[in-house]
Amino acid sequence: MGNTVQTDNDFMQMQKPFALFAKWLEEATVSEINDPNAMALATVDKTGFPNVRMVLLKDFSPQGFVFYTNYESPKGQEILKSMKASLVFHWKSLRRQVRIRGIVEKVTPQEADAYFQSRPRDSRIGAWASKQSQPLESRFVLEKAIARYTTRYAVGNIPRPPYWSGFRVKPLSIEFWCDRPFRLHDRLLFTRDSVEHVDWKRQKLYP
């Protein structure tokens, strides 16, 4: 695959998880075929069953990992109930993985508005037209809704739907995994007791 696997003296010596994540994401941006910011988002429904789906990371900082969605969708409702989530990034081209567990908060309306207005116009129309994850009688019904909202918002800015916004996952743990021969992989775990803490505990793990 042409990938370069980091050695123990490289990422296993890193002290700051967000700096390491930024480095890995930057390298994945070069090597991944598409969507290096794709991540698996895991939530739990009211019966205790887990659900997982792919979403796109839109921003990250020491404050957390941000993505946007329809709050009325199953993932939105599950997050709003528990305010907890897990994320996984898997970069096959680099043979690396990052696992994140944390507490979730809503982004501010100002953040959501700014990101929504940065999206392509057709995507903004789609946010109004799609009743995400609800039963759809036919594609034609969706296309009619798209046409209706295209006409409604033919001129000027398209406002953000009240049910469409973002979440920020504030991590309590971040684990970095790197493939090594014979499944003797490198694993580095950062943990903290509270999302308010800026200091992280750092621990190497057996494969």
Swiss-Prot record:
The record's Gene Ontology biological-process terms are: pyridoxine biosynthetic process
Could you give a GO molecular-function term held by this entry?
Answer: FMN binding
Q: Which cofactor does it need?
A: FMN
Q: How is the cofactor bound?
A: Binds 1 FMN per subunit.
Q: Where does substrate bind?
A: K58, Y115, R119, S123, R183, L184, H185
Keyword NAD present in the record's keywords: the answer is no
Per UniProt, the keywords (alphabetical) are: Flavoprotein, FMN, Oxidoreductase, Pyridoxine biosynthesis
Q: According to its UniProt record, which reaction does this protein catalyse?
A: pyridoxamine 5'-phosphate + O2 + H2O = pyridoxal 5'-phosphate + H2O2 + NH4(+); pyridoxine 5'-phosphate + O2 = pyridoxal 5'-phosphate + H2O2
Q: Which residues bind FMN?
A: R53, M54, V55, L56, L57, K58, Y68, T69, K75, Q97, Q132, S133, W177, R187
Pathway given in the UniProt record? Cofactor metabolism; pyridoxal 5'-phosphate salvage; pyridoxal 5'-phosphate from pyridoxamine 5'-phosphate: step 1/1; Cofactor metabolism; pyridoxal 5'-phosphate salvage; pyridoxal 5'-phosphate from pyridoxine 5'-phosphate: step 1/1
Tell me the superkingdom of the source: Bacteria
Name the EC number(s).
1.4.3.5
| HAMAP family per the UniProt record, alphabetical | PdxH
Which NCBIfam families does this UniProt record tie to the protein? pdxH, PRK05679.1
Q: Indicate the family of this protein.
A: Belongs to the pyridoxamine 5'-phosphate oxidase family.
**What does this protein do, in the record's words?**
Catalyzes the oxidation of either pyridoxine 5'-phosphate (PNP) or pyridoxamine 5'-phosphate (PMP) into pyridoxal 5'-phosphate (PLP).
Subunit details for this protein?
Answer: Homodimer.
By what name is this protein known? Answer: Pyridoxine/pyridoxamine 5'-phosphate oxidase
- Species annotation: Bartonella henselae (strain ATCC 49882 / DSM 28221 / CCUG 30454 / Houston 1)
